[in-house]
């Protein structure tokens, strides 16, 4: 198993959220569903499924293509944006009684507490999730489950920085020699970075970010962007960014390297859910099952560098196993009331 129970955050025990949402108290998850010929036929009649996602577009589109190859006649429409933008979009649409999306996925666990509370999600448990996902990687009432996990890592361009000179910790990023050479993603756009900012502020204190903000940071939006800035040579160091993008670049020969900071590396969990008012309910149900099956989870790992909860997924030997990485976690229940404070402090320290 690539993401074992020992590495799952106790604070991400999603059943905790049930206590916060008494209006949605349930007797438990519904009976798991299998993919049947009848479901496939009904999905083909609908002909399309719309997937709102925060996963890197290249990875999400590969998943969509794999689905189309397995189920000819059903088109996957991938709508990719940063987690916070996905959240804003679905909130605006549902607030206006507009229902375009069938399946939704973001890397901010808080979103799914809110989606569930608002009654926007359908109870649906694919058989694969029921069989293989640990209890703390799925909602106790069957509204959502962990589609992926990834880390927000420090990294560097190996043509611009020697290994012996590279930062080994978050504190090392405060060294004056890195001033003007660092790129960083934004918590107001990226769920990964919102989660990471929460974890790091609790571990290191806000004074760390205050000092980092004085390093003349190149500010970008998505956590997919810093690795690409390193690859293009626009900056030498990334303060944060998706581990999976770094895997993808490094494994194609791009001169980048990952650093797992001595203080710890933040973990982000990307949940997925079936929307209650999905315009293509059968195609949505089929696609929702598909994204959790072994082959899709293996595709996410092989092509996208994502960590999986599926016990059958095998990671590439060149990748550092989670058991050898010190991890930092964010509790979505504690993060939820702090989101606006985090955005305000970040703007104060980074000017954006």
Regions picked out by a protein language model, each given a short descriptive name:
Residues 121-130, 142-145, 171, 248-266, ...:
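Short beta-strand->loop
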Residues 296-352:
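C-terminal capping/gating helix-and-loop segments adjacent to ligand/active sites or protein-protein/ligand interfaces
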Residues 155-160, 198, 268-280, 291, ...:
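A bilobed periplasmic-binding-protein/Venus flytrap-type ligand-binding module shared by bacterial periplasmic
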Residues 110-114, 236-255:
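A ligand-binding cleft/hinge motif common to bilobed small-molecule-binding domains
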Residues 50-64, 76-91, 99-227, 231-234:
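Extracytoplasmic ligand-binding site segments that recognize negatively charged/polar headgroups
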Residues 23, 149-150, 178-188, 210-213, 219-220, 252-276, 290-314, ...:
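Periplasmic-binding protein-like
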Residues 1-13:
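N-terminal secretory signal peptides and thylakoid transit peptides that target proteins
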